[in-house]
């Protein structure tokens, strides 16, 4: 990247970035800037490609030089990251794998993947603060805020396209570990129940089993049994919102400390057993996919945090 002045950026378009519209490209370069402002600077001719004015639908070509004017990000957006510097630094400790194409991390429970909806900080905002030199960082998939484990981030548009294609074609395998109520029957290896999203009057999003919903399937395997709970491995075949949480509830075995689909009596039992658990026991343990750059089949595992390990050890000791 060349710099024309301390505040104006000149960006040379790479082959990986070619083919996208200039308005979409600017949205990746000007994080936190409203779309209305991006279209305004395009209309006013403040953005130039090869020193010429362009329209928002202009498609970039490799070798194009894009002039990006200084744009002041809203102060509240800038200030949002500063109280979370400790969280940003902590993200560096949970990176499981990184190369020029992808970054994989072990997302902590309680951290959203994206800021928004009243949250000023998310994993992707933290990674952008941690990797300010990265021109592209986008989530390949999502994890619920309270779910921990493997989270895949693309560092190139071509990588994101390849990995999204794998998701669409079911070429990516995700394995989760969940602690559920009661004794999961070994013969129940799959739950197939259509899921429908609902928005409550409070604005809360909830998912229910409904014949009007989308076809959904999760495969299950018993990993370990305890006196009043079971650790199961969950492999979603489809990727619906809250799928594992709703399918375990539908099967009669809700997940521990699930504030939306769980069972308060089960949570109380775990507390009285001295497990120390106070979070959703759902962990994305492994992710298998084809590397978008090398074609190598990769399987990346994320260890459980100490709180989940202590909980399981307590349950083992109580058997």
UniProtKB/Swiss-Prot annotation:
Active site, renumbered: 144
UniProt record, GO biological process: enzyme-directed rRNA pseudouridine synthesis
Classification via Pfam families: PseudoU_synth_2 (PF00849), S4 (PF01479)
CDD domains on file: PseudoU_synth_RluA_like, S4
GO cellular component: cytosol
EC number annotated for this UniProt entry: 5.4.99.24
Keyword annotations: Isomerase, RNA-binding, rRNA processing
Impact reported for residue 144 to T: Does not restore cold-sensitive growth to a double bipA-rluC deletion
GO molecular-function terms, A-Z: 23S rRNA pseudouridine(955/2504/2580) synthase activity; pseudouridine synthase activity; RNA binding; rRNA pseudouridine synthase activity
Residue spans crossing the bilayer: none
InterPro entries, per the entry: PsdUridine_synth_cat_dom_sf, PsdUridine_synth_RluA-like_CS, PsdUridine_synth_RluC/D, PsdUridine_synth_RsuA/RluA, RluA_PseudoU_synthase, S4_RNA-bd, S4_RNA-bd_sf
Taxonomic superkingdom: Bacteria
Keyword RNA-binding annotated: yes
Record PROSITE patterns: PSI_RLU, S4
Domain S4 RNA-binding: 20-83
Phenotype on disruption: No visible growth phenotype. An rluC deletion suppresses a bipA deletion; in a double rluC-bipA deletion the cold-sensitive growth and ribosome assembly defects at 20 degrees Celsius due to bipA are fully suppressed and decreased capsule synthesis is partially suppressed.
Reaction(s) the record says it catalyses: uridine(955/2504/2580) in 23S rRNA = pseudouridine(955/2504/2580) in 23S rRNA
Family matches, as SMART domains: S4
PANTHER family: MITOCHONDRIAL RNA PSEUDOURIDINE SYNTHASE, RIBOSOMAL LARGE SUBUNIT PSEUDOURIDINE SYNTHASE C
Family indicated by similarity: Belongs to the pseudouridine synthase RluA family.
Reported function: Responsible for synthesis of pseudouridine from uracil at positions 955, 2504 and 2580 in 23S ribosomal RNA.
Protein name from the UniProt record: Ribosomal large subunit pseudouridine synthase C
Classification lineage: Bacteria, Pseudomonadati, Pseudomonadota, Gammaproteobacteria, Enterobacterales
